[in-house]
């Protein structure tokens, strides 16, 4: 919701808005992939197509979208390694996989 904002301290210079905050990955069998705060009037699905379609409305040129999405996709693509480093079992990782591994996920951006 709109009150979900986070700030990062930027050394001794102050604060900056966090690029990501309060993101809760949920497996698709628990909740379908849709946005509670819709970014498109007609389609509330959490999809790469919807994200790309509204980029110009956010002042982002189509040619810039991949440059912005690629670092995020690379980070998300390492989710299993990060989970393992925190001692999360393979069974638990498999349970969460549909929250990270889907057609509109990091593999679509990194291809």
Say what each PLM segment does.
Residues 1-111:
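Anionic ligand-binding catalytic core segments
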């Amino acid at each position: 919701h709109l009150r979900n904002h986070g700030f990062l301290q930027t050394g001794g210079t102050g604060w900056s808005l966090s690029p990501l905050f309060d993101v809760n990955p949920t497996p698709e069998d628990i909740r379908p992939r849709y946005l509670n705060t819709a970014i498109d009037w007609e389609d509330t699905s959490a999809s790469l197509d919807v994200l790309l379609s509204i980029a110009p409305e956010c002042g982002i040129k189509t040619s810039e979208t991949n440059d912005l999405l690629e670092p995020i996709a690379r980070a998300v693509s390492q989710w299993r390694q990060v989970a393992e480093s925190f001692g999360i079992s393979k069974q638990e990782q498999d349970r969460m996989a549909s929250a990270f591994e889907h057609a509109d996920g990091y593999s679509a951006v990194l291809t």
